[in-house]
Design a protein with these regions (language model features):
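Short amphipathic alpha-helix adjacent to the substrate-entry channel of hydrolases
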Residues: 81-100
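Active-site glycine-rich loops that stabilize anionic/oxyanionic intermediates
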Residues: 72-77, 145
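Alpha/beta-hydrolase active-site loop
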Residues: 110-131, 153
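Glycine-rich nucleophile elbow surrounding the catalytic serine of serine-hydrolase chemistry
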Residues: 143-153
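Hydrophobic h-region of N-terminal signal peptides that target proteins for export
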Residues: 12-21
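N-terminal cap/lid segment of alpha/beta-hydrolase-fold proteins
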Residues: 23-66, 111
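Short beta-strand element of the alpha/beta-hydrolase
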Residues: 64-74
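Gly/Ser-rich "nucleophile elbow"/oxyanion-hole loop immediately N-terminal to the catalytic nucleophile
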Residues: 123-145
Length: 153
């Protein structure tokens, strides 16, 4: 194949990739403020580094969808949230799942903190199932490394 045909094919591939719809992505506080259970979208004053939150990836297509809470690893000292969180959620959303990436609390010796976060994330998904297009009876958890341990507790 000559160079011109290769360039044309590459250009078409890029155009087609750009035409694929991106999954809808939204971020919410994990823990409600002042007794509210409805999720609150993250605002400008939110402490992203220290407070737990979830990132929801909605799939295109049929509703209600099954959901999966994604717990990234990081040895309970940090989070590999890019490749073990957001990329995994995009993969699930492209296959018809709602995916919720959990940015959980670092335990600093108190492992009840992240355990409560994953339990809260599951409850948050179930409580908002109708608005998020999720089947509340089909909510699972997946995790990597420390996130896998967290998801199993």
């Amino acid at each position: 194949m000559d160079m011109t045909k290769k360039l044309i094919l590459a250009a078409w591939a890029l155009l087609l990739a750009a035409a694929v719809p991106a999954q809808q992505k939204e971020e919410f506080r994990l823990w409600p403020e002042a007794g509210k259970y409805a999720p609150e979208r993250l605002g400008a004053g939110f402490d992203r580094d220290n407070a737990p939150y979830v990132t929801l990836y909605r799939p295109e297509g049929k509703k209600p969808a099954p959901a999966v809470v994604v717990c990234p690893g990081g040895a309970y000292g940090g989070l590999a949230i890019g490749h073990e969180g957001y990329q995994v959620a995009e993969w699930f959303a492209a296959r018809g799942f709602a995916a919720v990436v959990l940015k959980y609390t670092m335990p600093h010796g108190n492992y009840d903190l992240p355990r409560r976060d994953v339990q809260q994330a599951i409850e948050l998904v179930r409580a908002n199932a109708a608005g998020w297009g999720v089947d509340p009876a089909r909510v699972g958890v997946i995790g990597f490394s420390a996130g896998g341990h967290l998801g199993s507790t």
